[in-house]
Structures are given as C-alpha cells and as structure tokens.
Amino acid sequence: MKTRFFFNISLQDSIFFKNKKMKILITKTPGKEDIEFLWSKLREHGLSKISNPEVEEKFLFAILAKEGEVIQGGLLGQVYYKGMHVQLLWVDESLRKSGIGSSLLQKAEELARESKCNLIYLDTFSFQAPKFYEKWGFEVFGKIENFPDNFTRYFLVKRLL
C-alpha cells in the first residue's frame, strides 16, 4: 500500500494553476506506473524538440564481471541523445585495484563508440573514484561540495569525438 503525503499551499485541499483545480501530492514510494508516465512524458517532450532519428535511440545496458554465477563487478548505464550515462560502476571490495573496473569502463566506452555516442558522463563522490575516472580521460565539469557533509560530489564527462 502506498503512503502519500499531501502538501497544501493554503488551508484549502486544492489549488488552482491556469484555472485547473489540482492537488500537490508527495510520495516517498512512487508507483512504477507513475515513474514510467513521468519519464515517458519527459522523453516525449525532449524528442519533440530534437526530432532526429539517430539521436532518439535509447537503451539501458549492464556490463558484468562474473566468476561462475557470482557477480564480482558491474556497470549500469543508459544510451540516449548520442551520449552514454554511466549510472554506476561497482567492484567487490576484495577485487578493487585488480583491473576489473578498468575493464568494465573500457567495455562501456567500446559500446559508446559502437552506438555513435559523442560523450560519456557520470558522477561520483570524493570517497569513491574521481581520480580513477580522470585517469581514463574524464574531466570534471561540475561539483557540489559538502554533499554529503565533508565530501564532494563530482560530475565528469569524456568527449569521444
């Protein structure tokens, strides 16, 4: 069962935007259908502005490092608008600095080039791997300091063309 939190701008149950009566709902457990609806509407709007079939290709992917049936490392990402977003790269702690992360990132870059991506982008925290990504040719284009406290979140990009 979903828990919904109501946020009222005034004492009224509803508010008006452009003569339409609406409620503003906050939920910490959004339903799959709500998430899919919002993403589809955002994508629909974006594609209406771009309208280039080459740019429209979109797919999710995973690159896994497995020992037998056990995942020892992996990279999740998404390709869209001629770019690749690396959502996460993880390697089992006992195998870090063994080359698995480099192999996963190299395979992702190969996939990005095959998919005609112009760039790869990602984010990482100061306690994770910003130096690792810089070693692979990524450049910091933004950062948020003290997020979380005493750490920095870095945003990096690698241009492929």
Label for each model-derived stretch:
Residues 48, 121-123, 139-155:
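Conserved catalytic-core motifs of GNAT/GCN5-like acyltransferases
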Residues 97-110, 135:
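Conserved acetyl-CoA-binding loop-helix of GNAT-fold acetyltransferases
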Residues 24-87, 92, 127, 146, ...:
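Acetyl-CoA-dependent GNAT
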Residues 112-125:
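Conserved GNAT acetyl-CoA-binding A-motif
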Residues 3-30:
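Conserved N-terminal entry element of GNAT/NAT acetyltransferase domains
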Residues 38, 133, 138:
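Conserved active-site tyrosine of GNAT-family acetyltransferases
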Residues 101, 105, 126-129, 146-152:
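Short glycine/proline-centered loop/turn elements that form peptide/ligand docking sites
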